[in-house]
Amino acid sequence: MEFTVLGWPPEAPTLRLDYRSFAYAGKFVLSSVGKAVLRTEDSSEIFTSPEAHAHVDANESDRGQSMHADANTNHPTESDPYDHSVLAALSFSADRTDDTTLCYRYVSVRSDKRGSGLGPRLAASLTPHAVDRGYDRLRIAVNNPFAYEAMYRAGFAWTGRETGIAELVLERPAEIPATTTYEQYQSGLTEYRKRDYDDPESTFLANRQETDPPALHTAVNSTQ
């Protein structure tokens, strides 16, 4: 498994992810956001959707062109626009009001790899590159307790703030993980407990009553 920064905004390359395997796949087509990925060249890890032949989804531009998934290739081709070597993807751009803060916009893990820690490892892997680009702070807004926990594992901590759409705002210094406390970690989970989730979120939150912040996940070495 390798970590790669594909590019920085505002002229980053597009990345086409299979919308059947990745949440927010359409967000990674935009060139206005930076992108970083965890990918594999191991043929046993290359994954295509069970729907072997599929049309392009509504987020794609060439709606009239027939697209087919080829299980023998892991890079985009004329017949298959998706990069099947990607295990997890992260999009990012500078904060709109503070150009020293880098905002993580979307973190998406391939469906068969969710829960394996790839999200926080990817988020942590970008941090030294953000420092090299002059950023001193990282920020992300999360809309569910699973993402909250994952970003804690990447060194983020809840700020006590929410966005206008009830996402919890987490931050960390770019160079080192955030300093956090049991009370700070639990207070963010309490905000989610107020929202009366069903399973699996309710069980997840119940299992984290009176627990300390999770251990950090390690970054992945960069190929660049």
Q: What positions do the PLM features span?
A:
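Segments forming oxygen-rich coordination pockets for charged ligands
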Residues: 93
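Conserved active-site alpha-helix within GNAT-family acetyltransferase domains
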Residues: 142-165
